[in-house]
A protein has these predicted regions:
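Beta1/beta-strand and adjacent pyrophosphate-binding region of the FAD-binding site
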Residues: 5-19
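Hydrophobic anchor at the start of a short beta-strand
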Residues: 11, 33-35, 98, 157, ...
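Glycine-rich FAD pyrophosphate-binding loop
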Residues: 12-14, 28-53
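Short glycine/serine/threonine-rich phosphate/pyrophosphate-binding segments
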Residues: 20-23, 161
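Glycine-rich active-site loop/strand segments that organize a redox cofactor
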Residues: 52-102
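Short beta-strand to alpha-helix junction loop
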Residues: 75-83, 102-121, 164-171
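Predominantly flavin-linked oxidoreductase catalytic cores and closely associated redox partners
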Residues: 114, 121-229
Length: 229
């Protein structure tokens, strides 16, 4: 006889990065604490530290449906209900001020850790149920919801685990086959933002150095692209 106690929630959010944590906080407010957040790492928002070159690129000045693919009508409706201004106001209410630089939105501290600290404190103040080092290996669809790892039942699931781009942060695509078995469809994933490899002997001493500069790419004598940053 199996006497294992199954914990029940209204909603389970899988993935405790920026999107997952913010989503869980807002849902927890709306559903009176009936939300759990499942994160495989030993701390929340682990990947945020790498965004914006360590400065935390929260958002951009211009955010609209033209920057998304897929169901444009859905994106437009979502952005109408929760706009970029809504996000900035949320952080302001949490005590985090922001600044704009070249169309990008950063915390005024220019430290990605500020974002992590604010979101973690907000989650704690809202008594959000957070399960760290929780690795989701199985999801079963049941009559009135979903069973996760045969021990957590929830009526709804929100998946915020990213793609396959950063395995060292836990973003390795492990949930994709599980979600496919549930009938979810995925487009093929390809590397889109990758490094350029060069001979390192002449630039080795520049490692870690940050400098405002222009960089131009040429194909022979033909200028292909110039980037400032």
């Amino acid at each position: 006889m199996n006497n294992k106690i199954v914990k029940k929630y209204k909603i389970a959010v899988i993935g405790g990065g920026f999107s997952g944590l913010l989503c869980a906080i807002k849902l927890n407010e709306a559903f009176n604490g009936q939300v759990t957040l499942l994160e495989r790492n030993d701390r929340l928002c682990k990947k945020i530290a790498s965004t914006g070159n360590g400065r935390g690129n929260i958002s951009n000045k211009v955010v609209n449906e033209n920057f998304y693919h897929g169901d444009v009508a859905l994106v437009k409706a979502c952005l109408k209900r929760y706009s970029n201004d809504s996000l900035i106001q949320f952080f302001k209410e949490c005590g985090l001020l922001t600044v704009e630089e070249n169309g990008r939105i950063y915390p005024s501290s220019m430290q990605a850790s500020s974002i992590c600290d604010v979101l973690r404190l907000k989650a704690k103040s809202e008594n959000l149920d957070v399960k760290l080092q929780y690795f989701v290996t199985d999801i079963k669809r049941e009559k009135s919801g979903y069973m996760i790892n045969n021990e957590l039942f929830c009526e709804k699931i929100v998946v915020c685990v990213g793609g396959k781009s950063m395995k060292n942060f836990g973003t390795d695509g492990n949930l994709i086959p599980i979600l496919k078995r549930l009938g979810e469809e995925f487009t093929e994933l390809y590397p889109s933002l990758v490094q350029l490899k060069t001979q390192t002997d002449k630039i080795k001493g520049l490692k870690g150095v940050k400098q405002q500069a222009n960089a131009s790419l040429y194909d022979g004598e033909k200028l292909l692209k110039t980037f400032s940053g």
